[in-house]
């Protein structure tokens, strides 16, 4: 067994783990970071995400004359997020985030060389205006992938001189504690089976959520909400809840609010899946007709994206069959169809400004043709009768 001593052990190489390790290194600490994935996929889901985030009271909002404030954002969150006023930790977290996201997220990222697109979007406003009351959704220029690669670069620079140890393809199987404090962890090299004994006066678990496991998601699904008959995985497959249960079983950690997940209603299988069950999330076209399995428009209230994603998920999950359709013409698709994530937004990801502006103005025919060629779930026909035949053949 190999032994390794550090000032800090970080379990999980996603965005939270990388930032935690980076800040510790800059404070003069030595860090051991353990991650299950390969070096090429270092960064977790952040490497593949689109890169939108809700931020409060930023300089960009002020420039756009958006009248936001921590008090206003907290009121929106408490109302739309249905936070229990007596629930201590969710209330404390929400308050801290709205009061510090401008400095500790927006300003901090700017200092790291990360750039935002010059627009702030109003999403999740609620079906009747009960959600976000002002625009808060900031978008990264370069997507989350660019940000993640930049922070990894900074991490390696801060860890030069031997202060940073990166253990890829390692899985933590045990947490150790001494005198009531976590004092280390046992990690397994998943390629060789070799064990590594990590010791540190501080251990940070940054292992993501539970949505990488369908079993864990279903186990925690709120009983008062319709559960979908089939699901795809748009999270990270290693965010499977194992370490949550390990911390609970070995150390008495409390797992709360696990059923409050953020899911999406309009997914389809990835044409070239990175892992079993890998799904892509479309940004539903507002001008499309959202149909059930019989080809009937779901209603009477239409399903429209950008207002209440949580409600969309419940409406789709309550349908008789586990699939729905978006019906639209090519013109609408070229102007409105989009897929969330860095992989299918290369104009933004690769910061190709002119190409991005061209596709925004003239339509993204490239993406529509790409999906037509690659995905059997993206059906194109010259007539409604021909399209109906293809839809019936698929289901």
Name every feature range the model reports, one short phrase each.
Residues 42, 94-196, 214-217, 268-269:
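Conserved redox-cofactor binding core of oxidoreductases
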Residues 26-47:
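Glycine-rich FAD pyrophosphate-binding loop
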Residues 253-394:
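An anion/pyrophosphate-binding glycine-rich loop and adjacent beta-alpha core
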Residues 16, 39, 296:
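Conserved Rossmann-like nucleotide-cofactor binding loop
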Residues 2-16, 32:
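Beta1/beta-strand and adjacent pyrophosphate-binding region of the FAD-binding site
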Residues 52-98:
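Glycine-rich active-site loop/strand segments that organize a redox cofactor
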Residues 21, 25:
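Gly/Ala-rich phosphate-binding loop of Rossmann-like dinucleotide-binding domains
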Residues 194, 198-268:
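Glycine-rich loop(s) and the adjacent beta-strand/alpha-helix scaffold that form part
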């Amino acid at each position: 067994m190999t032994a390794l001593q550090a000032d800090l052990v970080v379990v999980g190489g996603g965005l939270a783990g990388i930032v935690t390790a980076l800040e510790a290194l800059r404070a003069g600490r030595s860090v051991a970071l353990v991650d299950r994935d390969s070096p090429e996929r270092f960064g977790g889901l952040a490497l593949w995400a689109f890169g939108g985030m809700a931020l409060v009271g930023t300089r960009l909002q002020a420039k756009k004359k958006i009248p936001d404030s921590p008090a206003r954002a907290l009121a929106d969150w408490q109302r739309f997020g249905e936070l229990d006023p007596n629930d201590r930790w969710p209330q404390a977290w929400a308050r801290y985030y709205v009061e510090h996201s401008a400095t500790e997220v927006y300003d901090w990222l700017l200092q790291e060389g990360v750039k935002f697109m010059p627009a702030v979007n109003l999403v999740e406003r609620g079906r009747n205006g009960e959600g976000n009351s002002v625009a808060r959704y900031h978008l990264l220029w370069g997507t989350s992938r660019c940000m993640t690669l930049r922070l990894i670069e900074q991490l390696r620079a801060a860890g030069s001189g031997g202060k940073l140890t990166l253990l890829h393809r390692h899985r933590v199987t045990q947490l150790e504690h001494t005198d009531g404090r976590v004092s280390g962890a046992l990690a397994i090299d998943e390629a060789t089976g070799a064990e590594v004994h990590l010791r540190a006066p501080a251990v940070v678990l940054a292992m993501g959520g539970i949505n990488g496991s369908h079993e864990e998601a279903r186990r925690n699904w709120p009983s008062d909400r319709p559960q979908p008959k089939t699901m795809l995985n748009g999270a990270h497959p290693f965010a499977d809840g194992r370490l949550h249960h390990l911390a609970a079983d070995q150390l008495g950690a409390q797992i709360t609010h696990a059923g409050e997940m953020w899911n999406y209603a309009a997914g389809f299988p990835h044409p070239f899946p990175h892992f079993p069950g890998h799904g892509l999330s479309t940004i539903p076209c507002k001008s499309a007709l959202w149909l059930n399995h019989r080809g009937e428009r779901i209603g009477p209230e239409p399903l429209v994206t950008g207002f209440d994603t949580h409600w969309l998920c419940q409406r789709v999950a309550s349908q008789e069959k586990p699939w729905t359709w978006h019906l639209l013409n090519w013109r609408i698709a070229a102007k409105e169809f989009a897929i969330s994530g860095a992989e299918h937004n290369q104009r933004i990801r690769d910061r190709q400004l002119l190409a991005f502006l061209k596709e925004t103005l003239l339509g993204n025919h490239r993406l529509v043709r790409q999906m037509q060629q690659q995905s059997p779930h993206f059906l194109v026909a010259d007539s409604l009768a021909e399209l109906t035949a293809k839809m019936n053949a698929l289901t």
